[in-house]
Amino acid sequence: MRPEEIDLPCFMAATQIFIIHGRGAYEAFRKMPTEHKYLQLVDRDYYPWPSNEATGKIIQFLDRYLRGIDYVNLERVGIQMRLGNREWYWRKEKDFPLPGTQYLKWYLRADNSLSRDREIELTEEFKYTTKAGPIGQKCGVSFHSSPFEENVEFAGHFSATLTISSSMPDADVVVTLWAIDEQDQIIPYGSKGEPEPIAKGFLRASHRKLDSVKSRPERPWHTHKQEDYAPLGQDDVVTVEVEIFPAAARVNQGWRLRLDIAPAEVQPDVLGYNPLAMRRFYGEEHEAGTNTVHVGPDRLGYITCPVVPLRQGYPNVML
């Protein structure tokens, strides 16, 4: 059954940074015609979900639709807004994507910076090996923003538009967005203090063909069809639109963004970061060449972030 055909009350949970699994809940929430649908954006996986916070909301949902108790004020969308360093709060919203969302671009610059201003003069090629190195060694290339002048909250769909090439017939493009503090230390966004990014996504370059019907301004959609398979030529420079899965996090005043563009899920210079290696499921890793990110006035390169109105929710009660 497709989401468009479901007209029953539905209570859904979506993960923020557990790669693919949460995507179904976001898409189902958007497509379901019923008004009686509820979405909860939780942390990195499902395991913290059976908590005091979640249990209370599930009981409220069941009370409303099984027992007819109408006095319960259950928010339509609940968001675990991660603050970093084991902190978060729950944000109540009426819809997803959030009303008032602004999709702002941070551009890749030739000096390795991330800026709200596009590169208009210089060109640069950032090359990196397609094989991840040992612990402590940078994987891929990083771009850094200037310190934020005020607190900013992100919630929703991210995406990255990049211009790339490779010495290989294909390239895995893994995009990870971090925050770093005034001491250049990675902010851990995992609820238990583990190093987790703000958001991440990935794309295999040969699958870059977009579905013009299903793509939305805030979220690219790729066809992944055999007839659209497009390997890279030796001198091909192509533009890729990388879907970065929805997430929610606050970046404090004085912190900076760090955007990693890498050939693999890992980032050895972030100690303790152990992401699930999705490419292993396919057995098609490309580890014997060089990838290049192209930056310049005629080379598209930016990350789009969902900036939402700053708001304080209610205290977390999760265990």
Language model segments and positions:
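Active-site-proximal helices and loops of the catalytic beta/alpha 8
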Residues: Q40, N52-T55
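Amphipathic alpha-helical segments in well-structured domains
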Residues: A25, A54-I59
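Catalytic histidine neighborhood in serine/cysteine hydrolases
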Residues: M32-Y47
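Acidic beta-to-alpha connecting loop that harbors the catalytic carboxylate
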Residues: Q16-F18, R44-D45, A264
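Accessory cap/linker subdomain of secreted extracellular hydrolases
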Residues: M1-E5
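Short beta-strand/loop motif that positions the catalytic acidic residue
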Residues: I6, M12-A14
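Conserved alpha/beta-hydrolase "acid-adjacent" motif
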Residues: I19-G24
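Glycine/threonine-rich phosphate-binding loop and adjacent beta-strand/alpha-helix elements that clamp
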Residues: A54-G56, L66-L319
